[in-house]
Amino acid sequence: MTEMTEKATTFLTSQEAPAFPADRTCPYQLPTAYSRLRDEPDALRPVTLYDGRRAWVVTKHEAARRLLADPRLSSDRLHADFPATSPRFKAFRQGSPAFIGMDPPEHGTRRRMTISEFTVKRIKGMRPDVERIVHGFIDDMLAAGPTADLVSQFALPVPSMVICHMLGVPYADHEFFQDASKRLVQAVDADSAVAARDDFERYLDGLITKLESEPGTGLLGKLVTHQLADGEIDRAELISTALLLLVAGHETTASMTSLSVITLLEHPDQHAALRADPSLVPGAVEELLRVLAIADIAGGRIATADIEIDGQLIRAGEGVIVTNSIANRDSSVFENPDRLDVHRSARHHLSFGYGVHQCLGQNLARLELEVILTVLFDRIPTLRLAVPVEQLTLRPGTTIQGVNELPVTW
């Protein structure tokens, strides 16, 4: 046994392994348990998952980048030892996996079918439509005001309508898919998650049937007309791709919108800087993405071979979780990492991941957030929380970070 192997074996089996994931008590700060992990000198720390198994959590930014780009770490969620952070992962181990849970070359083949819709040029051309949608929902809020639930009346419907237009999904069905999505990503047990996925798949199967006769101009219609008809993708694979794009296309931006509003309102100096200089908005979006890191449990991997990282050993078959909320607070990369600073250059955060699995929709998310944060505060400059931030109910650490309700007034 080498010195490194002996150290790694002893470390993994005998060291304290705190429960993971942990819940936030503040929308824009790390859980205390994560701060402790971040402040440890080692790049890897063992944690205990809900089912009692252990996995490695990556605590350093540079190590996280290296591991996310390492082909010896697999994203295969069907692997028996994949580090599931919640019972709801059972829903992703049934049926055809989405490409987020695939490895090259299959991952690249499926991703390339959709990537043309998410290029910088294509997304830039969507700005007028996004602005129109944002203004429309603000008009509705103002007409019904002077109070609102920002989640249900703005943060959720804006990205829902945007992704519906992009995919060719009828927005008239938004109440169904928003509910099914919430039940899927916030399920606390396996049966609830599987039931939500089944409901979603039945809906998408019916939608694909309609698109086969009337494909329209959306991305799903194009996939039906070309990839499905040509046999490049089967029906189950198309359904799983559609589910991924629809859920990720509205859930994440909705959560980022709500938490960004909370965070700016709780940091009046940073909010004032943005109001005084709108050119800061793109950089502020990157800083908010860094600080909020809403998908901070999305970086699960399984080692297919032994990997040495900074003198520590990940053995083949061990789970690894790159928690971007921790990596984004690495003080060797970001000075004063727990401080929100809209003047900071934060573009190298890991909130969209890194490597071949880097978020497909990041250009769209950036556009939506830039428009939302500009237009919302221009139209409602007196916007404020209707309850103290301490009274907001935060989602648990097992799901996309956010709030399900956000009372505001003006």
From Swiss-Prot:
This protein's superkingdom?
Answer: Bacteria
- Does Transmembrane helix show up as a keyword for this record? no
Keywords, A to Z, come to: Heme, Iron, Metal-binding, Monooxygenase, Oxidoreductase
EC number of the protein: 1.14.-.-
**Record has Metal-binding as a keyword:** yes
Residue positions annotated to bind heme are C359
GO molecular function (one): iron ion binding
Q: Which cofactor does it need?
A: heme
Q: What class of enzyme is it?
A: oxidoreductase
Q: What induces it?
A: By sodium ML-236B carboxylate.
Q: What does this protein do?
A: Catalyzes the hydroxylation of sodium ML-236B carboxylate to pravastatin.
Quaternary structure and interacting proteins, as annotated: Monomer.
State the family it belongs to.
Belongs to the cytochrome P450 family.
Q: Which protein, by its recorded name, is this? A: Cytochrome P450 105A3
